[in-house]
Swiss-Prot record:
Family membership: Belongs to the ATPase epsilon chain family.
Membrane-protein topology: Peripheral membrane protein
Protein name in UniProt: ATP synthase epsilon chain
InterPro entries in the record: ATP_F1_dsu/esu_C_sf, ATP_synth_F1_dsu/esu, ATP_synth_F1_dsu/esu_N, ATP_synth_F1_esu_C, ATPsynth_dsu/esu_N
Main function: Produces ATP from ADP in the presence of a proton gradient across the membrane.
GO cellular component: plasma membrane; proton-transporting ATP synthase complex
Pfam family, one: ATP-synt_DE_N
Name of the gene this protein is made from: atpC
Keyword terms, alphabetized: ATP synthesis, Cell inner membrane, Cell membrane, CF(1), Hydrogen ion transport, Ion transport, Membrane, Transport
Compartments (UniProt record): Cell inner membrane
Gene Ontology terms for molecular function: ATP binding; proton-transporting ATP synthase activity, rotational mechanism
Length: 138
């Protein structure tokens, strides 16, 4: 079967680089599925799990806190604001981030502070959803 080269990078590090049969990730309008030969595309991505189906059929999960997706017919690049390997996700840390964001929303008065708290809450909720999804896969 044909493959597509996938690179998932953040400002801190390259998280994944290798061939894949399929990539799924959260786009602005819903879940995007990318196969080899896909039409070129550039779009923003939402916080959530990137699922990479490797050549051998195994899956790799990477949590991204938003970013940009570039698709070329034989190459997918995910430029993530923050990226964490699925195996490195910490549920307790994500729960604490969610609690802190909810508390921030209650105690903020300016629209900018509320928007920042909402963004942090969305990332924490997406991280918890990614953890739950990983548990179901095991």
């Amino acid at each position: 079967m044909a493959t597509i080269l996938v690179d998932v990078v953040s400002a801190e590090a390259s998280i994944f680089s290798g061939p894949a049969k399929f990539v799924a990730l959260p786009g602005e309008s819903g879940e995007l599925g990318i196969l080899p030969g896909h039409t070129p595309l550039i779009t923003r991505i939402q916080p959530g799990a990137v699922r990479i189906e490797k050549e051998d059929g195994s899956e790799e999960f990477v949590f991204v806190a938003g970013g940009i997706l570039e698709v070329q017919p034989q190459h997918v690049t995910v430029l993530a604001d923050t990226a964490i390997r699925g195996t490195d996700l910490d549920e307790a840390k994500a729960q604490e981030a969610k609690r802190a964001a909810e508390e921030l929303m209650q105690n903020q008065s300016s629209d900018l502070d509320i928007a920042r708290a909402q963004s942090e809450l969305a990332v924490a909720a997406a991280q918890l959803a990614a953890i739950a999804r990983l548990r179901r896969k095991k």
